[in-house]
Amino acid sequence: MPDKLSKWIEENLLNFNYKRKSLDRYKKVLSSLNLKYPEEIILIGGTNGKGSLSELVTELARQSNLSVGTFTSPHLLNFNERIKIDGEEISDDIFLKFLKKIKNLKDSDDLNFYQIISLAALYYFNKLNLNLWVLEIGMGGRLDPMNSLEPDISVITKVALDHQEFLGDTIEDIAAEKAEIARSEKPLIVGSKKVPNAILDKASKINSILISQRNNKKSNFLKNLLKHFSQSKAISEEVLFCLYQISKRSKFKFSNELILKVSENTKLHGRLSLIGNTLIDSAHNEDSIKNLIDYIHLNFKNKKLNLFFSCSEQKDPHKLLKPFEGLIDKIFLGGNIHDRLMPLDKVLLKTSDLNFNFIKMDSIQEIYNSVKISKPNEINLIIGSFYFSGEFFKFLLNDKGLPLSISSLNKLY
């Protein structure tokens, strides 16, 4: 992020607490904005895949000549990525302008960091008179700011264990939190083959139009789409199912041809991103690690794998790395990369009983140098966190003399 925007966020927002709060104060501030809502709002939640789905739906709209505002989190390179218009990041000046507007509103002092950012996005979208808003839930659903709106379509891509300290210890606990984005008489699309009871109960209670793999007969096109991507695992079955169902339930009715085109051509950075012989994937929970290993078995048989790992402070590195036993002998652990990532010594302490040769790497520079000298027939895996993926991408772009932007990432493939 350029200095001006970065400095303002650091001084005015980063000291705001991240604690999950009731939405009462948020809804009061939101109401004061008197927003004019678009023709359609799509609200996308889920443990894994919601960011990918948000990008794909945005691309469907963009290629249909619709104006679309997209709100996602977290970001890889710059804060600006969280707010996009027709797939393009918000400019620094406009972002700062709307952040200041929200910060100066009455009652905004009690809002947390994420609530301020989301209000700035909605206020900006409102000024542009867009056709469609694509809004990603940050975590859970019940207390997410975007749940203050009235979506036309709600989506839960998949429910898996993650953020248990906030959402609960079981799949059903987490599903109950996510189910709160459902609306009466409106479509609730669920990508999981097995729909948790908490979601079934919520949908039944409020009479949502539940659309899932268990209760929806697949069209020939959808069957072929799922089969096509099952060979590579590049996009999960859950995401593809949700994308197809959104396209058919949306008032804009996106074509099958466009679904296929967008699915094949949209670059999902930090999600199985293969650049040369380096795979950058932000897998950061047990479910996404399983998907990554499936992808490795399908695409990198008999290849030597170099695993570079760093995870967020709240994660359990033991659970994330144990599935690689028997597949990888040594793991390069990244340290001093980002202040949200777990210190090296703590990772080692939590993984001491795993059967790996751990090698400490004290900077992103050291990791990048190791990747650069790897042999062409080796595959480097950069995994464990969006923060880790983002820092690696930044170093890669700097090394090639490219600006830190998503459009620059598109040039790397």
Annotate each predicted stretch with a short phrase.
Residues 141-143, 150-207:
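Conserved catalytic-core segment of NTP-binding enzymes
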Residues 42-43, 52-69:
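A conserved segment at the C-terminal end of the G1
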Residues 19, 23, 27-30, 34-39, ...:
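ATP-dependent carboxylate-amine ligase catalytic core
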Residues 1-2, 149-150, 242-245, 287-413:
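ATP-dependent carboxylate-amine ligase
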Residues 1-17:
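Charged, amphipathic alpha-helical linker segments immediately N-terminal to NTP-binding catalytic cores
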Residues 47, 68, 134, 157, ...:
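Residue-level signal for inorganic ion chemistry
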Residues 57, 139-152, 393-397:
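Short Gly/Thr/Asp-enriched flexible loops that form oxyanion-binding sites at enzyme active sites
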Residues 40, 127, 132-135, 145-155, ...:
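Nucleotide phosphate-binding/pyrophosphate-handling subdomain across enzymes
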